[in-house]
Amino acid sequence: MEFIDYDTFGVSDTISTSAGDGALPEPVAILNLNALSFEKPDEHNEINLSELLVDRGTTDGGKNVNLNAKMSNYAKLSMESLHISGTSDNLSVNTLPSYIPDGNKESLDISKLVFQQKNQSLEATNMILNKKLSKILNDYSFSNYQSTSYLRKSLNSLEENKVALSLDENKLTNPGYIGTLARKTLKSDVETELLKEHLTVLEEFRPIVRKIKKLSSSIENIQNLGTSMLKESKENATGTEEPMFDRIKSLRKDIDNLKLKKELLLSIRDQYTLTQVEDDKISNGSVDEELFEIINKVMRIKEKTVFMLGLENPNAGKSLMHEVNNILQRLNRKLFNHLLDILYIFESGTNNVNEKFLSPNEKGVQTFQRSLIYLSNDLEYFNEFLKRVTSLRSKTVLDQFLSQFDFNSKDANPIMLSAYDPLRYIGDILANVYSLIANEADFVRSLFNFQEMQMENTPVSIIQKKDEFLDGLDSKLLNEIIQSLSNTCRIRIGQIIKFEDNPITNFEIVKLLELYKMMFERKGIKSNSSLINNLSALGVVSQEKLIECYSNFVNEIEKTTYVATEDFLPPEWLSDYLVKITDLFEAYEQHGGRESDTNEIIITDTFLEKVIKEPIENTLLKQLKEGFPLAKKEEQARTSLYTVQINCFDLIKSRIQPFASVIFSKDGEKNDVLKWISDKSEEVINQMLELQKKILFDKTGLGMYNNLLNMIFPISSVKDDLDLDMYYSLSENSLMNLDSINTNVHEKLNDYVPIALTDMQGNLLFKLTSPVIADKICDSCFSTLSEFYITFRKTLMHIYPEEEIKIKEILNFSEEEFKTLVGIE
């Protein structure tokens, strides 16, 4: 923009023409208005401005004349700008008629005079500035919209920043010499800033100019050489191609070959070497995405280097491969140290720090996992890191587990063993182990689960390593870490099982062990791990201890002897033993019965044989036989033995039968035990039945004849009179003589049959604890006796039809009478 300056009106030209002095005029001192005499107004009209300078001590006449002319011109222009009446041509420079006050005192009031002059000066200044601004704005160079907008922005910027730029508006618009200096100062400052900006721009071109100057001599040489070559070629022109151009073509071809070689070498350098920045990143940088990109580049270099080994001269490939391996070794060592730092920070950090590190929003886990993926390329470092992880975490987990048994720690809540509740103690131990497994599983899976890792732009070899070494790594580490708890857990639980004699408690322990085995496996513990194997071994020990509880009880019973009582009740120990068994069966039923796989593991067919069958067969029956040593010789002792055995089996069946559908499966081997008990009971009942039949037949005298007839043809098979013909041969037997029959049968039959029912019920049936069995034996015996008596009577009448009356006298009870006497309807 143009600066508004009064000196533009010829002052500078006049000064420049002065002899040998180009300096700007200096401002004069302010006139002392009070020193003037205003009594004679006419005197002031004739003031010569040049005389003022004489009074100030100015002696140079030529200089005063020039200054006087300048001031006259200045005053003239100012008066024209203020529209003062009168023409400027007739106005004398030496007179100021309009501005000299009158001689009276009122007109000489300094304040009014200054105020009036100030208003007039401000008005004159505004008019001059308006003209200047109008001239600038109407300039053709600012007629377009862009220039106008730029000018408007510049003016607005000056207006807004006048305080920051220390612009004094009053000074800049002052028409006096102070305003002139202020505007010149502003102009100088603006020009200085413009010069600085121009210098800044030029400084940017300095390197370019310097390079161009360096090439200037070479360019001149090339130009000169080209000119000489063209001149030489014209002078030596012939009908064939010029030799000079042949050389040029040859040189150009060489240049193209060199360029191609250069491009090839640069491409090889870019593909097979690392930059200095990348090498510095390996040595001093942190592990981040940039380092992973460098690793990918090194791996790609290694993959490409393999092809160089197939060249005729593999030395370059071997050298490059050696260098790449060294770089990979440095990278793997860096990744190894980085992973160890994270591991140690996690071990020594607080829970809040660890949770923040494991947060999905944090990149620490992703960096850790990706570092481990790349580290898997070096199995030595990879396996060493896994060993460090396993050892550190195993120690931490074991310390946390043992702290639960520390009674001296103030912060610990120790697990205490109660003499009355060992099951709770074992449960607390297993619950503590489970919580440690759960926490460790969360930690391991958050760091070592690589299923969702993004592997873009990753070399194929790295991805193959991931699939080979990293899949299932979290489960592998978890099992190796938790392995440290297996022996400690086994020792503490084994101490409880070793001294536990309650079969129900042992059963509950087995159930508890199986439950936590299942829970551990669901958390990722493998079924073949040492912890699961130890729990299985403890379960086997507890099962053996369960069987041992019953075996010890039976072994103590074997040392005693059975003493028969008058009522032939089972031994007292049998009831106690059955109570122990039924308590176990009730616990079995409460825990789900056959629907529980754990129950099926505990209550097996082998267990039932050892706990039920073997004690009955080897202890109970043996003890009962020893209690009746004459049972083989005497029917009465044998009857007592059978009675006790029937009562024992009836007691066993009554206690076990309610659990038949729960424990003794119908299609399994467990049912064999229950079937054996039933068969054994039926066997004893049948033996008792046969014995009672024999006694009954002997007491009635029909025993010998019963055997005789059944030897020829079974009595039970006789259906009609034709079957009686089978017994005709008996007529030749002397025992079948009616007199012999009368002697052997008649008296006994008449004496015992009326009291047979009462005798059997009184001496036998009342001693059997089961009325059903007693009725069964009684009914079967008398039914057999009645059937034989009727058949025997018919047989005699069939053989000796002429002796019917005698036969009726010997066997004097009719069929109805006999049945009535023996209680058969």
Curated annotation (Swiss-Prot):
Bilayer topology annotation: Peripheral membrane protein
Keywords noted in UniProt: Golgi apparatus, Membrane, Protein transport, Transport
Superkingdom classification of source: Eukaryota
Biological process, per Gene Ontology: cytoplasm to vacuole targeting by the Cvt pathway; intra-Golgi vesicle-mediated transport
Chief location bin: Golgi
Subcellular location: Golgi apparatus membrane
Pfam families assigned: COG6_C, COG6_N
One GO cellular component, as annotated: Golgi membrane
SMART domains: COG6 (SM01087)
Disulphide bonds in the chain: none
Family named by the database record: Belongs to the COG6 family.
Function (record text): Acts as a component of the peripheral membrane COG complex that is involved in intra-Golgi protein trafficking. COG is located at the cis-Golgi, and regulates tethering of retrograde intra-Golgi vesicles and possibly a number of other membrane trafficking events.
Protein name: Conserved oligomeric Golgi complex subunit 6
Gene: COG6
